[in-house]
């Protein structure tokens, strides 16, 4: 029983090998451009997959009986402040609508910041006085979800949260629950903004406010604030060291940002230090200019430990990048992508989407990424946030240019014709159950817990794709895997805290019962599915 998962994979491999052996003695007849034996082989493999899937569906209820009759006890990892949590022990924010929430008056926020810069108030005023905070109502209007709020000083504000109420309802429903409640320390004391659960998954360190571009929009208003703010080496080291002291001590991806982080004199040194102290992933949010200018700089960054280039990318031609004020910026991006990929740095296309400016580029950018899937890992579309250089935007322009997560889901379908908004999209936090599974499988003695994104479901969404790099074709994972159900299955498996061999067997069973052989790509085999899942959970299954 301890090797049951291995047996399932080997059954598939042996079945394939037997078919190959038989094919050696087959007559080859052309059938629509393919050999008859190849057709028979593929058909046999699909039959074998269906048998395994059917067997898994029969076994699954039996495993659930075992889990109800006998459950193990959760342990407390040394990186965590408490024993591992079951779903029933997790807490949830308030969802649905109408509901009230805490918000900010955009005018008050600006006034408070200016008073601190002028020396009229200390920065601790932000922590102790909660300036600019007001209540807001989240309601549905004409099928849209909007936030409505009133400031006694500056009047009424209204903004769109979603253009599709059913979409937002689905996203909130899939939230898996909060992580550990975080112990309060002086490092976490940020007033109302204090992270109260978990610890986040990305530590963003702004190395400098200098930049070699003049973008519009710019979240940071780089180069325009009238002074240079650049972290000294002691500051960088202190931030990275302090982050390691916070529990739960989960792994994080450190993202160096700015301004343009590559302009910092400590950029390479900071990357090296991250790897030395144990951060497993280091990325840079960059416009790519320095990497385009110098392949040697890209190599130096890779050698230091840079894993991901979070590359600003607004469209697939120079015209779509004109708001960045560089006429040939797309050509620069192509050179940066080539240089980064050549040395082994993963490239993520990061697109700030502004409604009526570049929202038509969503489909072309996805297609560009698919066509260059040997160089590009994934796309990150970021709906515009009116901060920094754009905080003085008029209410009329804000409504005109507002772009929400629901806009993105519908634009992907409209511009690619492939995905389904109410099936293929998930909150980023939906990956939490897989992190919980990995935490259990890795045992109590790990120095770090698994990376876990616990952000609010209104914060970010994602869609998993299966890409055929040879044919440049793609499918959403939900087309051939019941992702909604497998997430629930993983929660049930982890909550049972069974012996590891039984947990592994149940995970393989869950993968099989949620696999749809008839809709999967022809090249996709069950053993590939198991191996990919194992890779995504940090090798917890092997």
Language model segments and positions:
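Amphipathic alpha-helical segments that form well-ordered structural scaffolds
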Residues: 104, 273, 335, 339, ...
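A short acidic, helix-capping loop that chelates divalent metal ions and anchors anionic groups
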Residues: 224-226, 317-323, 389-392
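Flexible, glycine- and charge-enriched loops at secondary-structure boundaries
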Residues: 225-233, 323-330, 398
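N-terminal [4Fe-4S]-dependent radical SAM core
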Residues: 74-204
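Radical SAM/AdoMet-radical enzyme domain recognition
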Residues: 237-255, 264-383
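Radical SAM enzyme [4Fe-4S]-AdoMet core and its adjacent flexible, acidic
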Residues: 2, 7-41, 45-46, 50-57, ...
